Amino acid sequence: MAKNLILWLVIAVVLMSVFQSFGPSESNGRKVDYSTFLQEVNNDQVREARINGREINVTKKDSNRYTTYIPVQDPKLLDNLLTKNVKVVGEPPEEPSLLASIFISWFPMLLLIGVWIFFMRQMQGGGGKGAMSFGKSKARMLTEDQIKTTFADVAGCDEAKEEVAELVEYLREPSRFQKLGGKIPKGVLMVGPPGTGKTLLAKAIAGEAKVPFFTISGSDFVEMFVGVGASRVRDMFEQAKKAAPCIIFIDEIDAVGRQRGAGLGGGHDEREQTLNQMLVEMDGFEGNEGIIVIAATNRPDVLDPALLRPGRFDRQVVVGLPDVRGREQILKVHMRRVPLAPDIDAAIIARGTPGFSGADLANLVNEAALFAARGNKRVVSMVEFEKAKDKIMMGAERRSMVMTEAQKESTAYHEAGHAIIGRLVPEHDPVHKVTIIPRGRALGVTFFLPEGDAISASRQKLESQISTLYGGRLAEEIIYGPEHVSTGASNDIKVATNLARNMVTQWGFSEKLGPLLYAEEEGEVFLGRSVAKAKHMSDETARIIDQEVKALIERNYNRARQLLTDNMDILHAMKDALMKYETIDAPQIDDLMARRDVRPPAGWEEPGASNNSGDNGSPKAPRPVDEPRTPNPGNTMSEQLGDK
């Protein structure tokens, strides 16, 4: 930044000097008005007058000098001067030099060209590559000294590591494979959800292989100029040929490798040209021996089939979400840099985090360390890991949000309805935690934690989920009446409706329609796929689908209503527990469902005489209630956005 400022200052000084030297020179001496000059001529005080256009340099008889200017053409001036014996000297007008004329005429164009070059250099990354380097590859070559990641830093994806380990062995000992006639795959495509470690695995390959490693993003190819993408692909492979054997890693390849065909607008032509060049370079007329292309994407469905065929990306490595054993290994890798308390058990944390990716687990360990740092602790304990898990799963607490007692009570009934139905219906995930503390965008959260990694779901389990989703709305309706039901169940209704529609149209859970696929692909339109969609069902079939979805919803809605009506004592008791403790866990829910006195949550400190429930002791055991409580008109708009 300082160098650029100095450069511009030097340029400004030079330009000012040039204009100063090429500009008209100012006359030395004082200036006198023309009338005074004429008066002195008439008084015979002037000895010499040098006339240069309208400027007159005057020398008086007493040797004083001054300059005056003729305001208008005066035809009598010359006669008057000669009459008074004034020496008249004529001087030619001052003309600029040829160099100055050329410079002044070309300066605006040169300035525009200079500004254009400056901005082009800035767009090329700071001006270090030259103004015409658009077609040069942006791939960065990393040497073995720059990459410290190894397979020891990658955990939770043993099968994927075994697949890519062959690449490393080939690069180290190619003769071992060649003598048996084997050929190493030219390309490996790593596929998996976001955060599962695809890029980390590529770094580990580079660290283990000890060969040059070129890395580039799929979005670095296509830019504002036509032909830049294809040129960069050619240049990248030219560089790789010079450094072979080597590895090229293309992250997020779906940015440039999407399926060719009709798309939106005409901008896809440049991307297709780039893709065509990549197809030729990977397996075209000229071979690229010793170059292995590794790519990563989380959208393999949009890639062009020609890119996925053998000879280009021969092997697809699925890097999926880790299972419980993989999560434990990942946690141990990230825990190596954190001082841990003796009570830390990675296996317990792994069992409580189903569905977490490697990035989620890394974030979990980091959040736990931050919680410990806020508490001025020297080690990280299980308490911090529980707080971190709740924050990631349910959102950050918003204790500063002001809620009235009526809103808290409505939220407590809503969340209690979810929890009770979740405990009473079959095959439902266990209730892990219920809270009325606002978290994220929700005023309250009921969190269900699966006991293991979910692979598939039965029809009974899905219907239980629908019943549980409507438990919150039904609790409000039963307690306060239909006219006081809030909008807090909007997200629950959306999720339940989508679940029921999928059961009918995709999973064959309708006796009337049978095991047929009725759902149309509803993915977003993207470049490389046709915009037009064909209709695959008649209007009558669509009407039957709507009827089946509605019947499925109503059946589970009525089941949830009956369960809540039969357990009103538990509903009121759970509301009281939530109003007092704000957050209850599985042990408190077990006490409530067993109609026992509720034990305080772990770490609970009695606040004294003041508490939300108006009772200093623990909430009492549920007791049968014959009539619903009086509706509270102050909670008609309690919004639990995304409360489940």
From Swiss-Prot:
Feature type site, description Substrate binding: F225
Gene Ontology BP annotations: protein catabolic process; proteolysis
GO MF annotations in UniProt: ATP binding; ATP hydrolysis activity; ATP-dependent peptidase activity; metalloendopeptidase activity; zinc ion binding
InterPro entries xrefs: AAA+_ATPase, AAA_lid_3, ATPase_AAA_core, ATPase_AAA_CS, FtsH, P-loop_NTPase, Pept_M41_FtsH_extracell, Peptidase_M41
Active-site residues, Swiss-Prot/TrEMBL: E415
Family: In the central section; belongs to the AAA ATPase family.
Protein name (Swiss-Prot/TrEMBL): ATP-dependent zinc metalloprotease FtsH
Organism ancestry: Bacteria, Pseudomonadati, Pseudomonadota, Gammaproteobacteria, Enterobacterales
Gene name in the database record: ftsH
